[in-house]
Regions:
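Non-catalytic cap/lid and distal C-terminal segments of serine-dependent acyl enzymes
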Residues: 1-157
């Protein structure tokens, strides 16, 4: 920033809703397969930040990024996927791309788990730049999930 290679950055961090998985506020906010959370951020959170800190945030989706870890990582991709008019840069660290969506949506029966299996492969290309960071010790977990838990990386190439 000091060398003017990138513009100033405003980082806004939001705590997730309570509980975990289906039936809880967190599943409603972070894991629903729609643009609702992005719309909430756009219409409720960002205007309050602009007013409280006397800022003018860009509306240009090329100048915005969304990021998160765990459920926040999947929420970040969901926000950009369904609202490319708002976000086109995504950073997800150890994103939990699982099915915790609530309420159930028959259009996306696998929730975020469907990104690598059906959603990305069966969709037109989107103007999203995606950075994914994950650990490399998943297979040491004695509770390994389904066999195709790593196919997300194949689907995203």
């Amino acid at each position: 920033i000091a060398q003017k290679r990138i513009p100033p950055i405003v980082l806004i961090q939001i705590a997730n809703g309570g509980g975990d998985a289906q039936g809880h506020q967190r599943g409603r906010e972070y894991d629903n397969m729609s643009g609702l959370f992005a719309e909430y951020i756009e219409t409720e959170v960002l205007p309050r930040v602009e007013k409280a800190y006397k800022l003018k945030l860009t509306k240009d989706p090329e100048g915005r990024a969304v990021m998160g870890s765990s459920s926040g990582g999947s929420a970040s991709l969901i926000m950009a996927w369904f609202r490319t008019d708002l976000y086109r840069r995504v950073l997800t660290t150890s994103g939990t791309f699982v099915n915790q969506a609530w309420p159930f949506d028959p259009k996306y029966p696998d929730g975020a788990w469907g990104f690598h299996k059906t959603i990305i492969p069966n969709s037109p290309k989107k103007p999203i730049r995606l950075f994914i960071s994950v650990g490399d010790r998943d297979l040491l977990n004695p509770n390994v999930m389904r066999d195709d838990m790593h196919d997300c990386f194949i689907a995203l190439h």
